[in-house]
Structure formats: C-alpha cells, structure tokens
Amino acid sequence: MCGRISQYREATRYAQHLGLTDPFMLFDAVDRRPGYNLSPGTHPLAIFPGEALRAIHWGYCPDWARAQNLPQTINARAETAASTRYFKDLWHTGRVLVPADGWFEWRLEAAPPDQHSDADADEPPAAAAQPVRQPYYVRLKRDEPMYLAALSNVRGTEPQTEGMGLVIVTATADVGLIDVHDRRPLVFTPEAARRWLDPALAAPEIEHLARHACVPAARFMWYRVSPDVDRPLVDEARLIEALQ
C-alpha cells in the first residue's frame, strides 16, 4: 500500500521534470513548505490535466458511501479500480498525479540486542524480544522526482468539501522491491505520467499503463530510517536520512 510519502522539492521542479510547458499553480507558494512525512489527511500537491498543480486532501469518500457511514479510503488497487463502485468513474475522468520524492514502508524485524543488559550469565535466557516495526524509505537511485498515479473527484478551482480528495493507486510489488507486503505505489516515468493525465486516453490504454508502465524495482533503493516517522506530526528532513 502507500500510506506515507515525501514531497519536499519545489513545485516548479516537479513541473519542469515532468515536461510541463505552462504549469498553473493553484496554491499559495508562501504557505507551502517541504513535506518529508505526508500522511493521509494532509494536502499533498497533485497535478491535473491542463497542467494545473493544486494541494488536495489525501482521502476520498463518495457521497453514496458517506450516506452509508463508510470510511474514506486512501488507496485504489490498479487491478480493480476500473470496476469498483468507489473508483470506476474516477478511473476514466479523475486521473491525476501526485509528484513525490519517495515513500515509506514498514516491516517487522527482530529487535536489536540489548547492549546494556546486566543479567546474570547463570540465569536462564529471557523470552525472545518482540519484533519491531522498522520503517524504510524508498526512493529512485538517481534521486529524481517520481510520479504516483492517483484518482481525484476534485475539479478545477472548486472548493473542496467533505468527502472530496484523492487516492493513490497501488500495484502488485515487484520481486526484489523491499520485502514488506505485496503492494506498492503505481510509479510512472515522466513519459508514462503525461499519458496518464491525457483525458482522451481510451480504456485499453489506461489499463496498459496500469499493468505495464510501473517503474521497475531495479531503479529504486531503500534503507532504514528513524522510527520517528511513525509520528505523523513529525515532519523533518532527518526522517528520510539513513540510520547509521
């Protein structure tokens, strides 16, 4: 899945790298600051057809789902989004991109040994320590921006009301990409990302992008980072630095 991203570069850098010719910034640059630990409920930048960039709530719940008191969702599966009630309309009319510099994953690992134990060597060994949930940061080896496929029901400059927002599309993880679970964000190169934004793209082409255009695992690197990333209110550059 994708539940935490970094998006710390200037918006103009994402636009230039993507090859936008006339980007339209629909946000106040004065109020924007680098995001190293963006979680659902925050407002990452999204890129829309027409080259507009806008800060969008991460989380989505259509009106019919809200009426049934169903929870908002933050991800959509690439394999099923085109046919599920939550996302089938957005799949064709609400494709956007979330520019990112990396994302976080967690996996259970053995707890580090206690280097300061004063236990008597003659005492029986204590029970094995519980595994810890270790965060990892995943980024491109070339440390360039990446573009996450996303869906949104926000249009133009209309106000965002309850239930409106975006979801990040996930795909099956490659063999070799950090062995956490079987999902990862659907990450595009700039060329594939521009095609994803094309509102005239036919359904078979959308499906082809979702199934075959994901950046392969060999182009990524990942490493352990501070467990402070578990705290959504902590948003500092040190969170994407490798642990010694």
Predicted regions and their residues:
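Short linear sequence motif anchored by a di-proline
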Residues: 1-244
